Amino acid sequence: MTDALQIPRDLLPADGRFGAGPSKIQTAHLDALAATGSTLMGTSHRQAPVRDLVGRVRSGLAELFSLPDGYQVVLGNGGATAFWDIATYGLIQERSQHLTFGEFSSKFAKAAKAAPWLADPSVIASEPGSRPAPVAEDGVDAYAWAHNETSTAVMAPVVRPAGTSSDSSLVLVDATSGAGGLPVDLREVDVYYFAPQKCFASDGGLWIALFSPAALERAATVAASGRHIPAFFDLPTAIDNSAKNQTYNTPAVATLFLMAEQLDWMNASGGLDGMVARTTESSDTLYTWAEKSPYAFPYVTDPDHRSLVIGTIDFEDGIDAARVAAVLRANGVVDTEPYRKLGRNQLRIAMYPAVDPADVEALTRSIDWVVDHL
């Protein structure tokens, strides 16, 4: 059995969690959650302890992203997946353009196409492992793409399409796995939305979005247009509740707490620049190793497209990546398997800010050892 191989302990990472999400949660933050005892968990989300926690998350995000004047931090339940439907109800007026370059970026396009009150979206697609670019288009009032395609480990720039303006069209960026680990200038985007279980080292179930003034206005305009919007998807309700440091319905309090702890750590460790420096160090280590390896190579061929926060590494046909992942898992190095629908002979490795760059280097040494002993 290959999973019976014992990797020498001096080669192993100190922490073996490399999953793309749910991702590594710092144990100190779990200890801090336990230490709250009876003061937070199990108390009303309409009272000060939980509302103060929501405020802590919102202010932490404002600090991390240097929130421009007029922008607001809005949050609600359901995760980033729910936000695609929220956007079809409350942000797209008539027609959207979508960049699709993997499983998750394509899902928003499918949601827009399925909405009978919207015109069929414009879709610009590229093969997995590469990325397309947005193009100004008449009749489009929302441009949407992912900052980081989690399934393939391709990152895309966040730049407003040339020839467009927030006066007539919004830029909606799915930053689920990129926010907090990739650089961004929020002045280039109207809604930058994400979830806590990636760079923010928490659990899932919430969506968080940074809204520009134009996006806030659009949400109000669409809501007033007479379009039927289910209460759970109503953005003005979420915006109003968020301004009061609460959510429309009961949030996952532990998720908020772990995110707040991570935000405190991020802001105390150099802010967004410090986090990008961490993910850059980790990804440089991974890709340099793969480029020098006799049996592995980066799946994403263009270095400019390679993600800082997720790495996909292909293996030569003679090496079974699934067997490598199985041995790693048996040795406590977990969740390096590739995205299931991509169907590649590869490993997928998360390098979010909570992951120590030294552990990424140790992972490469462990992989080399496993391949040598298969």
Swiss-Prot record:
One of its GO terms (biological process) is glycine biosynthetic process, by transamination of glyoxylate. One of its GO terms (molecular function) is O-phospho-L-serine:2-oxoglutarate aminotransferase activity. L-glutamate binds at residue 46. Pyridoxal 5'-phosphate binds at residues 80-81, 104, 150, 174, 197, 249-250. It catalyses: O-phospho-L-serine + 2-oxoglutarate = 3-phosphooxypyruvate + L-glutamate; 4-(phosphooxy)-L-threonine + 2-oxoglutarate = (R)-3-hydroxy-2-oxo-4-phosphooxybutanoate + L-glutamate. Keywords: Amino-acid biosynthesis, Aminotransferase, Cytoplasm, Pyridoxal phosphate, Pyridoxine biosynthesis, Serine biosynthesis, Transferase. Its EC number is 2.6.1.52. The keyword Amino-acid biosynthesis applies. It is found in: Cytoplasm. InterPro entries: Aminotrans_V_dom (IPR000192), Pser_aminoTfrase (IPR022278), Pser_aminoTfrase_mycobac (IPR006272), PyrdxlP-dep_Trfase (IPR015424), PyrdxlP-dep_Trfase_major (IPR015421), PyrdxlP-dep_Trfase_small (IPR015422). Catalyzes the reversible conversion of 3-phosphohydroxypyruvate to phosphoserine and of 3-hydroxy-2-oxo-4-phosphonooxybutanoate to phosphohydroxythreonine. Pathway: Amino-acid biosynthesis; L-serine biosynthesis; L-serine from 3-phospho-D-glycerate: step 2/3; Cofactor biosynthesis; pyridoxine 5'-phosphate biosynthesis; pyridoxine 5'-phosphate from D-erythrose 4-phosphate: step 3/5. Belongs to the class-V pyridoxal-phosphate-dependent aminotransferase family. SerC subfamily. The modification N6-(pyridoxal phosphate)lysine is found at residue 198. The gene is serC. It comes from the Bacteria. GO terms for cellular component: cytoplasm. Its cofactor is pyridoxal 5'-phosphate. Its main location: cytoplasm. Pfam families: Aminotran_5. It comes from Nocardioides sp. (strain ATCC BAA-499 / JS614). This is Phosphoserine aminotransferase. Binds 1 pyridoxal phosphate per subunit. Homodimer. SUPFAM superfamilies: PLP-dependent transferases.
